[in-house]
Amino acid sequence: VCSGCLTAAKEALESGARVDEAIRAHVVRANNSRYSKVNEIAKYLVAMFPQKGTVMTQCFGETIVGMMLKEAKLAGKEVRLFCPETRPYFQGARLTATVCHDMGFDVTVITDNMPAFVMEREGVDVFTCAADAICLDGYVVNKVGTFQIAICANHFGIPTFVTGAPDAGHPTKDTVTIEMRDPEFTLQAMGVRTAAEGVKGYYPAF
């Protein structure tokens, strides 16, 4: 979207048109195109769900999880969800689980170290997540914790479905940068310190 806005602005300047209107028009077109694609992706995803089953997800963007659940309702599918909390910002608990609850679904938040146990004990049918980037070489990049959940799902024979589209900005996984953020965030929960002073933290993120 940003690169498209820059292109639209340059073209507007060259043609003498209003830059703000050109940028706004581009954003509207880009978002409409994006939401249309997301809705189609949601339909394909829900088609993979059992008529009545259990789905585990991971810090799912509100747009796609909302469309996924909308399509599940339209298809008459009874779905319950397990959602890892996604520390240290708790996006899974605060955002994803809230959307699921607001749309009337049975949703349970679990800590980030529980997915394997829940998969084995609760009969998870599908693991699905969004993708911050899908590289052209096939690599999928999402929240760091997604990696371990996908491995667990593979171990238990649970199908994994990723929602998203290939990103031309990432031809290979080598173009993806895993950022090392402030480790202090892993030593606290919502601003409340949970580790002793002097303990080190480690916080890789994308």
Report residues per predicted region.
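N-terminal active-site beta-alpha-beta segment that forms phosphate/nucleotide-binding
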Residues: 1-109
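Conserved phosphate- and dinucleotide-binding cores of soluble alpha/beta proteins
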Residues: 86-206
